Each structure stands twice: as C-alpha cells, then as structure tokens.
C-alpha cells in the first residue's frame, strides 16, 4: 500500500516526494483507487457517494466524519509544513489507507459512537489525531482501526460528559 511504501522509504532515508515519484503514486490515482492497496482503500469518490447517500437518508450525522477528516487535514498540514520531506501532507493522508472508509462508515457506527454532537466531535478529533500519531510515529503504517478502537473505549466517558439534556417529565 502507499502508506507502507512511504513508511519503508522514510526508514531507508528517503523523502516523501521522492518516494511518491519513484513509485509512480499520484493523488488522482489515489482518488480513483487506481493503485494497489488493501480492501479499505477503495475509490474515495465511491466511498464519498455512499457517505452522501447515508447523509441524505438521515442514517448518519456528519459530525464525527467531518471532525475526523478535519483533524487529519489540519494536523498533517502542520507536520508537513514543519518537515515536508518526512511527513505526508493532508491530501495524501485523506486519500490513503482506510481513512475515508473509517471516517465515513466505521467511526459513525451507532453502537460504538457517542450519542451527543459534542461527544461525537471530540470522538472524531481523537480518532483523527491518534490515526496520524500512529502513521507518523508508530511501527504500523495505518492507524485508523487502532484509533477507532482506542476512542471506542472513551465513549462511556464522553456520553457522561456530554449527555443530552432531557426536556419535560416522564
């Protein structure tokens, strides 16, 4: 996968731009899934169409997904501005690995996500941040599944901190 290739290349002393050019990776290929990868690295366009369908049908709310993707974009931008040779930028991080699949479909699971909007935003920010920390500093090139599992353990606490106010009497 592109994440694994980048990670290996960086460990061997390469830089992000050189590794991408050497392996023929482009953002358009990543967007259309015209590149080797795992099952979760399907076409970003197809995944986003499915996400929009679920939003229109009011099956899910966008807050968790937007907070995951927004956090990944902002944090990876900061890191790539600090050292662009060692840290991949926002577009690469948003299009690679299982980022879109995880943010749109796995993180928004009813059973394991917070009930309130504020809790969902904190949940999404945590997922995005942990994912990037694993990608940048961990031994494993992908971090989405681990980040979701870690943040799932915080859901009871988030539900307690950001509980919905009840109106009226029962």
Describe each region flagged by the PLM.
Residues 47-87:
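Membrane-helix boundary elements
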Residues 79-84, 130-142:
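Hydrophobic alpha-helical transmembrane segments in multi-pass integral membrane proteins
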Residues 83, 106-115:
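Alpha-helical transmembrane segments
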């Amino acid at each position: 996968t592109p994440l694994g290739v980048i990670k290996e290349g960086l460990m061997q002393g390469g830089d992000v731009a050189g590794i991408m050019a050497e392996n023929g990776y482009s953002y358009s290929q990543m967007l259309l899934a015209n590149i080797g990868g795992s099952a979760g690295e399907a076409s970003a366009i197809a995944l986003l169409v499915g996400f929009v369908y679920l939003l229109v049908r009011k099956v899910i709310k966008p807050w968790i997904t937007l907070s995951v993707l927004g956090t990944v974009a902002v944090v990876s931008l900061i890191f790539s501005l600090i050292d662009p040779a060692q840290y991949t930028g926002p577009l690469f991080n948003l299009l690679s690995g299982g980022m879109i699949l995880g943010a749109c479909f796995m993180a928004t699971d009813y059973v394991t996500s917070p009930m309130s909007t504020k809790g969902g935003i904190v949940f999404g920010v945590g997922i995005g941040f942990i994912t990037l920390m694993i990608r940048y500093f961990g031994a494993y090139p992908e971090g989405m599944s681990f980040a979701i599992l870690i943040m799932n353990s915080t859901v009871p606490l988030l539900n307690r901190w950001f509980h919905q106010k009840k109106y009226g009497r029962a």
